[in-house]
Amino acid sequence: MKKLKTAMMVGLAAGALGSATAAAADWPQWGGNTLGRNMFAAGATGLPDKFEPGDFKQGTEDVDLSSAKNVKWAAKLGTQSYGNTTIANGKIFVGTNNDSMRDPKHPGDRSILLCLDEKSGDFLWQLVIPKLKSGKVNDWESLGLLSSPTVVGNRLYVVSSRCEVLCIDVDGLANGNDGPYKDEAVYVHLDTGKPPAKLGPKDGDIIWRYDMMDELGVFPHNASNCSIIVVGDMVYACTSNGQDWTHSNVPSPLSPSFIALDAKTGELKGEDDAGIGPNIFHGQWSSPSYGVVNGQGQLFFGGGDGICYAFNPKPVYDKDEDLDFLRKVWWFDANPPEYKKDKTGKTIKYPAAEGPSEINATPVFYNNRVYIATGQDPEHGEGVGHLVCLDPTKKGDITESGTIWSYKGIKRSISTVSIDPGNGLLFVSDFSGYVHCLDADTGKLHWIYDMKAHMWGSTLVADGKVYVGDEDGDFVVLASDKKMTLLSETYFPAPIYSTPVVANGVLYVATQSHLYALHDEARAKAATDQKTAK
């Protein structure tokens, strides 16, 4: 496949999170049940540490479960699946492409939001998203839907490959067309020249639609993919604004990089005041996180300029600009001086291996600290990276004052960290194929594990284990411990570019072509019996 553009995807105070209506053991958004986006599945026990994906039935791409081990079910996706899986209220949502066409009235290259039944993996409905007419400069062919859906009650929020923020009914059209948006039949054929489609109960139902290209003039570079965060009645998203095909020009330097929308109506409520546009290295593919610092909420965002920002979540009206702004609280340049200029003082140009990078990973807020790593588009290859732990209680430019610790042993990374609250260990993968284990408080390195292949997804910590896969299809289970212990290594028959997730005692691993639900009944029963005995 040419130019795999995105795992740049390669996702509140108690009671303030709308997705609390999902079951506590669900995984309703990128980061599970925490707006801090820590890749940790709290309360998960009895998860499998060994499994086999099984063989395909002869002449098909259907998994023969009799040849598998600890596989509850396996569902066919498309041929490229980068978006991370979310699970809420008995439904699974995952992004993919249309190469495994489920409906003949929607042929050709499309992005797909797929909804499956959590218990069986059976198909429930899909939202078909047509490709942008402008082509690969904004919407690279065959990539599919890259955003990890966010579920809040009976609504789902996602950034489409058309650079839209969509609010969607989790039941699709099966319970009618709820509106106010009623033009789904037209939408699914946008830019195709086809008349409105005849839709049914297995098609998606859009509640509202906010087109960031039309409304804000943004210019996404090759792909749009932010995983939305919902805080109270507000939706926050990265706009994916970036460079054009020349890789030297930002067509819309004044367009915002980060916005707030009304969760019920989709109305624009605010945009960032950071002025990131002119300084974008390449594209912008980070997703926001949220935390409460000294009683005040902060939104954390990794910019395409290599700077990590904290914004006040409450928009403030600016009379001079006649705009509502999300005001900066602090900002931190994550590129050390030696990544910007060499020993002779000469500027190191992006995207040189020894040079500066943007931030594609999601900032993680944990224990009143913010963790973030730098990296680049995987097409740019390997290079130097930087992992930092920041103090979010500071104000203004905290590049000099805000570092609690930093780690330059990591290479370029588009992965989000995972921290185990039980032992204070931090795990993070990098694009060069290394899994790093550090002390989250001090930054002390404990060990490095070599996967021997590029890694796009993030580590997941759950049940005392660390789960992670790579682009060769290798999937490892490591012990969450200061001593490196490999519990198992499994080969899946397709690359793994996304992050494993856990919901209701089941581990989900998405390859490019299949979603596997992994469950060890014996271990799960033993864990349940142990809890009951206590």
Describe each PLM feature range:
Residues 22-534:
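Noncatalytic, solvent-exposed loop/strand surfaces
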Residues 14-23:
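C-terminal segment of classical bacterial N-terminal signal peptides
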Residues 1-10, 18:
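Bacterial N-terminal signal peptides that target proteins for export
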